[in-house]
Amino acid sequence: MKYWKKYTREKLTKRIDEALESTIDFQSSKYLGYPVSKLDENVFNTNGKILSESPLLKSYIANPNNIGCHTLGKSEEAFKGSQELEKEVIQVLAVDIFKAEENEYDGYIATGGTEANMQALWIYRNLFKKKYHATLEEMVILSSEDTHYSVHKGSNILNVENVSIPVDFDSREINIEALDAIIKKLIKEGKKYFMVISNMATTMFGSVDNPDIYAEILTKHNVPFKIHVDGAFGGFIYPISNRQSTINFENPNVSSITIDAHKMLQAPYGTGVFLCRKGLIENVLTKEAQYVDGMDLTMVGSRSGANAIAVWMILFSYGYYGWFEKISTLLLRTEWFCAQLNDLNIAYYRNPFMNIVTIKSEFIPENIAYKFGLVPETHEGDNKWYKVIMMSHVEIDDLSKFVEELRTHTN
């Protein structure tokens, strides 16, 4: 790893203190033009002793605004400290995890995977409009039926049709013949420009799509397309556990990627990440935001600099090898759990590089599912699956109690 290092507690604190020192202190400064201030001292303790012992809490009190996309260069000078740490986060994720070339990427910390996925669709819609003078009716989004519901939100907001591709019930793999037939039909109906959401660990199954399947068929039909990888859940696991993965920026078919720090990285909510190749994010430049230094190319505008510092702090507390050890532990627990299910002849789906196990509902009584907090595929109608996720708090002791309940039920 070129940039992803493990820092001591002292170095982490020093870097964060330096970042905050180079960010305007609205407690003491008299800047008149910013609609910004520190947190309200009548409500929040802005001078407590605990702040000196917690650089992250100090960041939240300082309340920096990371508006803009800092990989492009110019940004709001008032918040340059927290922006610099965000740039380091994007650098680690783009270069070290997703194998982008130096300075050939852009990105920012979004509010979550939903925003990051919608950012990608927004970029590609505008790109097709600018480059090909495409109409909304000529564009279409392709995504598997297991894709996160954010694609439907994006489709609705951007007014671009989304078409779901069927997957095999047991393997959760995209039905290639159906994909080919659907693309043929869409072209015949007048669709000319295709946006793809390809999954790196679906929310329900942890299943991973092969983006090259989409690329091969779309290339065969000679239509322009862009592929976005939704790695909201899998982005901090799959590239670590599967070192042979080609779902990264070395793959020319991949144009952008979503990752969520507030899932596996256990960062505060509001810490999704959007990454893309250079030359794409400019398609959503908001020219009217002229009072923002460096302009704005993000969907939400103002963003928490403290959240960016939180993600930076977690990444550099672990370093690559510390994170590898953590993921390896979770995968060992997952393998142990799967072995118990095999002994009980319980049918389930699991991608071998992921920590999600999704069990067919016929093997799980509703009272057991409720007792252990299993998540169903649907709360409405005929549910066919329940999922178990080996997060950090889910230990083998917890899993063994669940297994014993299942054993009693099956006997």
Descriptions of predicted regions:
Residues 365-372, 401-407:
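Short amphipathic alpha-helices in soluble, non-transmembrane regions
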Residues 91, 380-411:
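PLP-dependent enzyme catalytic core of the Aspartate aminotransferase-like
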Residues 1-104, 385-386:
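N-terminal entrance/gating region of PLP-dependent enzymes' catalytic architecture
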Residues 86-93, 116-125, 151, 311-315:
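Buried hydrophobic packing segments
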Residues 108-285:
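Conserved PLP-enzyme active-site core in the AAT-like
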Residues 103-104, 349-356, 380-385:
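Short Gly/Ser/Thr- and Asp/Glu-enriched loop/turn motifs at secondary-structure junctions
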Residues 345-371:
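Conserved PLP-binding catalytic core of the aspartate aminotransferase-like
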Residues 240-243, 247-351:
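Active-site C-terminal subdomain of aminotransferase-like
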